Amino acid sequence: MASSALICDTEQWKGLQAHVGEIQKTHLRHLMHDVERCKAMTAEYEGIYLDYSRQRATGETMEKLFKLAEAAKLKEKIEKMFRGDKINSTENRSVLHVALRAPRDEVINSNGVNVVPEVWGVKDKIKQFSETFRSGSWVGATGKALTNVVSVGIGGSFLGPLFVHAALQTDPEAAESAKGRQLRFLANVDPVDVARSIKDLDPETTLVVVVSKTFTTAETMLNARTLKEWIVSSLGPDAVAKHMIAVSTNLELVEKFGIDPKNAFAFWDWVGGRYSVCSAVGVLPLSLQYGFPIVQKFLEGAASIDKHFRSSSFEKNIPVLLGLLSVWNVSFLGYPARAILPYSQALEKFAPHIQQLSMESNGKGVSIDGVQLPFESGEIDFGEPGTNGQHSFYQLIHQGRVIPCDFIGVVKSQQPVYLKGEIVSNHDELMSNFFAQPDALAYGKTPEQLHSEKVPEHLIPHKTFQGNRPSLSLLLPSLSAYEIGQLLAIYEHRIAVQGFLWGINSFDQWGVELGKSLASQVRKSLHASRVEGKPVLGFNSSTTSLLTRYLAVEPSTPYNTTTLPKV
């Protein structure tokens, strides 16, 4: 029977609710005058510096949040995750993405078995295969070396690896390793995405990686069959074994598809898709592009944060502090969204990955025991690199809705540029905005200041900034593979902390199932109408009307022959 105990029933939660009234009487422009408060609201680990002094919080707020963490048994829940306890209770699974980057000699158990040797077995296999591939020893059906890789997956099999790939592309060491190679990702079942993923590629020099744990994911397998046809139509059916490999545990279906099971790389049911970047899902395609040593540095960066998260006191624990502040903003101050604003173009795919990681993990309406939550949980995550975002949606953040912001900056640019005679370098210009925006949000601009600047009276309401808008700043020393791994793990653990505090299961995703089930019904109806001429039946009037309108137009691809992209 489900327990009715909820975190909101605790004295610590109620104490924070009462404390909101005190915070609402404050303004950040005054709180920021307290130098000791500002100093206290920082944390540092391996050169990563967190400043959360621009949060609508005081030392008392933080003490109350630490007590809430204690009431939620946060330390115990973190330990259970690292121990391999089945904290994903709805699927009866361990949650062990930390094992994917653990040192070879570490012991992490699932069902009483140390999984680390098996993880390293797969990594060793990836290392060997990627070295063979990159050396030119692995050749395609015509004897040519393969230099292009298309990774086919969706959701966590796509967004996480894409984020890391985008971040590594301009890192000098990684870029040097990737010279003469291309890595592309195919996720959307939209044929336009297929066309884009293979545009200007030659099947002769292309390897396709199919990422599907069960080898049954509808979108991924249709895309895989499409690329298989692209290869076969050019090189013949025997080419599949040389031009396609898999990340899957279903070796029977892998072999049936035409891929040699020896070229299938495993991952496990204790790895959720959105937490799978450090498994073969990400490590294999990234190693083919950049070489395993680069990817191992990425894994080591993530492992360093795992250690920090597990062992540091909450007062100086970066993922814990971030998670606590998110709960404070969402559940107590009533801010439902968060803007992720990396001042680094290399991190352009970071916000989309965190959007999935956060919203799929914590977009839940019931507790882990199945009790309806009577409070707000989960966040709406979005973002764009600075300074692009400043010319896009910052207007709303400054003068519209209050949206807490994560500003992420990098001390050393991957690609430094300076033009002689300019006031600052290109990177300093970028970072000038990184340092200025949090203060603009916190302090705002008062009518009195505008009067002193002799702004016309009729413009004063339009140029007034209320300020008091919370943000935090995360400053990374550089953006090598190691720091990219650290950044990923910080956000993975932050999101877990939020779920642990809210008392929800951050590691299942039942919300995606209903739509998939309904899509299956529509798929059958489309087939019956296209092939057998049957009318649309079994849907409500609105859906029937939409389907009828869609089917009234002759399809651009006849159903009696194969059609591949023309781009």
Swiss-Prot record:
Main location class: cytoplasm
Q: By its UniProt entry, which InterPro entries does this protein fall under?
A: G6P_Isomerase (IPR001672), G6P_Isomerase_C (IPR023096), Phosphoglucose_isomerase_CS (IPR018189), SIS_dom_sf (IPR046348), SIS_PGI_1 (IPR035476), SIS_PGI_2 (IPR035482)
GO CC, sorted alphabetically, is: cytosol
The molecular function terms of the Gene Ontology recorded here are: carbohydrate derivative binding; glucose-6-phosphate isomerase activity; isomerase activity; monosaccharide binding
Which keywords does this Swiss-Prot/TrEMBL entry list? Answer: Cytoplasm, Gluconeogenesis, Glycolysis, Isomerase
Out of the domains of life, which is the source?
A: Eukaryota
Keyword Ribonucleoprotein set for record = no
Q: What is its EC number?
A: 5.3.1.9
Q: Which Pfam families is this protein grouped with?
A: PGI (PF00342)
Specify which residues bind D-glucose 6-phosphate according to the UniProt entry for this protein: 156-157, 212-217, 356, 360, 391, 516
Q: Where in the cell is it found?
A: Cytoplasm
Per the record, the pathway is: Carbohydrate degradation; glycolysis; D-glyceraldehyde 3-phosphate and glycerone phosphate from D-glucose: step 2/4
Q: What does this protein do?
A: Catalyzes the conversion of glucose-6-phosphate to fructose-6-phosphate, the second step in glycolysis, and the reverse reaction during gluconeogenesis.
Task: Give the protein name, as stated in the record.
Answer: Glucose-6-phosphate isomerase, cytosolic A
